[in-house]
């Protein structure tokens, strides 16, 4: 009988490490902020990095929507990485850590 972890042995997991070199793009739209950064993540037991663009858009009701776009191509599923990036961006925004 296979143990539960044996079922996931072949799945490659991408783990978020950090966002670095965050730079804000100048914009004349007050409710939309666009940033560029380097995301560092762990994949196959080594650190890799890619360029990303993320946007924080404030709605009229005060909600904030975050979108993430990878500027470099990726050849593997990155849903968990995108979710982690969005969580980090929201955390930085709340704490005032974005430029």
Q: Whereabouts are the PLM-identified features?
A:
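Acidic, low-complexity intrinsically disordered segments
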Residues: 2-5, 15, 23, 49-99
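Short, solvent-exposed beta-strand/turn "edge" segments of beta-rich domains on protein surfaces
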Residues: 23-32, 43-45
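Short connector loops at helix/strand junctions that flank enzyme active sites
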Residues: 32-36, 47-51
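Short beta-strand segments that buttress and anchor functional surface loops
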Residues: 37-42
């Amino acid at each position: 009988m296979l143990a539960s972890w044996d079922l996931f042995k072949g799945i490659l997991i991408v783990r978020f490490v950090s966002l670095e070199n965050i730079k804000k793009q100048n914009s004349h739209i007050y409710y939309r902020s666009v940033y560029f950064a380097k995301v560092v993540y762990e994949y196959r037991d080594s650190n890799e990095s890619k360029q990303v663009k993320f946007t924080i858009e404030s709605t009229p009701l005060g909600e904030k929507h975050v979108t993430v776009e990878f500027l470099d191509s990726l050849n593997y599923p990155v849903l968990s990485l995108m979710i982690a990036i969005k969580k980090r961006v929201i955390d930085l925004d709340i704490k005032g850590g974005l430029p």
